[in-house]
Amino acid sequence: MNTIDKKQSLGGFEKYLPLWIPLCMAIGVLLSLYTTLGERIEALAIGGISIPIGICLFFMMYPAVLNLKGSELRKLKDNPQPILLTLFSNWIIAPLVGFVLAKMFLSDHDELFVAVILLSASPCTAMVLVWGSMADGNQEQNVVNTSLNTITIMIFYAPLVALLTGIQNIEIDRWGLAISVLVFIGLPILAGLLTRKIVIPMKGETWFDETYRPVLGKFSIISLLTTLIVLFALNGNTILGSPEYLLLISIPLLLGFVIVVGINIAMTKLFRLKYREAAVTVIIGSSSHFEIAIATAIAAYGVGSVAALGTTMGLFWEIPIMLGLVYLTRYLGRKNFW
């Protein structure tokens, strides 16, 4: 098994995300019981969009799109097979598996059904750079795939979500869905491109990659955890009154992950990918962009909705599961599976 020269790892704070996430959920529930934070946040809104949540969502998304490098897309022609397999998994396999499982377990719970679709139809563009590096995967392929995901999510996400929810006869504001994608992905992409255009000529690409992006990455995680606290502060009564919602959505999410990972491992074996390419394909093809799923759920159903609450469970499970997947791919690599 080959390794890359410079391997990324989670920082001290990020290593404990599996602890911070449930802690923030608990803090949010306690705040809902003993304070009026939820009501005050709901009052800070313009046109139905919560200003504090909007700020948090922007800083969740903005650091991720700083990874977008148009120049990297030219490398697609060098070794297209693993990249195309990853796109196939992201846009065909994962959404279909999510739809089937949501139909099996959540047919009577429209907002939870939508939450599963929002998660399964959103390929990751940020954390997979770290997961792929920790697995000693091909980082050039990783950057190309995340750049492609950033672009394709602008094109395919809203139509795919509308299609899959429409098959289930769930009414969703399609224009609102498209607008939320433009706002919560389009604006951060624009800001990211402008940042690269302005900052790199001034400070250099090394400073941008090694100093600026890591600092913004901290803002992303803090914004993510703040959003969790707010969401659970607004949904505390719902959670305590109906804790089965969290269990209900966890079943298709966990089953879906196992199925999609299994398909991706089999697919990379079938197409005889080498370890470094297979690891990245499995990791990216099996991950979700929980930030855009949360943002879209809030835009479509409101900050205090069951749909928004449901998408947070994608985040709850994603971090520990992806860490486990890193260890699984490394184990398979040591056993010369690929």
Regions found by a protein language model. Give the residues of each.
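Alpha-helical transmembrane segments of multi-pass small-molecule/ion transporters
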Residues: 1-66, 71-286, 290-338
